[in-house]
Amino acid sequence: MGGKMNFQSKFLTRSQSLKSLLCVGLDPDFDKLPEIVKRSPEPLVQFCKEIIDATASYAVAYKPNIAFFEVFGSSGIRQFEKVIGHLKSNYPQIPIVADVKRGDLDNTARQYAKYYFGDLQVDSLTLSPYMGLDSIRPFLEYQDYLIFWLCLTSNPDSAQFQKKRFSETGRTLYEEVVYVANLVAISNLGFVVGATSPSELETLRTQNPNRIFLIPGFGAQGAKLENLLPVCGRNSLINSSRGIHFASNGSDFAVRAGQEAEKIHKMMQTHFIGL
């Protein structure tokens, strides 16, 4: 199922061109949208389009989160598809990571894969690994695309399961996820590793220099960029969502988002050569 520029090539080209690792998250939480946007017939589309257009000069990738669209039912799904269409039509060089966190049986996973990779043709998805390899095989059939397995997430309670250790192997759950991925030599697979665990991030990067990491938790969740850049390596996407698109909730929201993205971009550029 080839014929398109694969995720890895798209990501590397964009990252090296901008000398940056910035992934702009799109989490259009309706309650936090500017009032001027809330009055729009399609507020999620308007908000995301304006954020995208204001930040496109600095974004290595975009990561729309499906939950903020699904809450509006069929209207939300239509708006999600329009946002994806806007990105693909106007910024085809920028990869799209659909943050959907799917994880289900083989026959169900096949339908998800067909929708996101076959129909929408987003470049990448976030998936849960906890139902095992058969839950991701349908996605791997789309070889030009990439999946990000949830590995060590940035939320405060992630340690309740992800840092539990298996007595028979000595590995934690998140380490087991990495071990299985490497054991079966899946090439078009990356890991979600939270910025809120810099020590574990550094170890995982040392052990997996060629895997692409999606790193949430920077900005609104408290992680500092200066702590991330020395340890994350170039094969990383450092995501900022609320810190960029909710920099203002006034009529200047898009301008402020662009300014915030530019500021992060410049900080990343100063460190990029040394990564």
From Swiss-Prot:
One MF annotation (Gene Ontology) recorded for this entry: orotidine-5'-phosphate decarboxylase activity
Q: Does the keyword Nucleotide-binding apply?
A: no
Which superkingdom is the protein from? Bacteria
Entries under InterPro entries matching the protein:
Aldolase_TIM (IPR013785), OMPdecase_type-2 (IPR011995), OMPdeCOase_dom (IPR001754), RibuloseP-bd_barrel (IPR011060)
Keywords tagged on the record: Decarboxylase, Lyase, Pyrimidine biosynthesis
A Gene Ontology biological process term: 'de novo' UMP biosynthetic process
EC?
Answer: 4.1.1.23
- Give the annotated active site: 101 (proton donor)
Which EC class heads this enzyme's classification? lyase
Query: Under which pathway is this protein filed?
Result: Pyrimidine metabolism; UMP biosynthesis via de novo pathway; UMP from orotate: step 2/2
- Catalytic reaction equation(s): orotidine 5'-phosphate + H(+) = UMP + CO2
Q: Name one Pfam family in it.
A: OMPdecase
Give the record's family classification: Belongs to the OMP decarboxylase family. Type 2 subfamily.
HAMAP family for the chain: OMPdecase_type2
Write the protein's name: Orotidine 5'-phosphate decarboxylase
Species annotation: Leptospira interrogans serogroup Icterohaemorrhagiae serovar Lai (strain 56601)
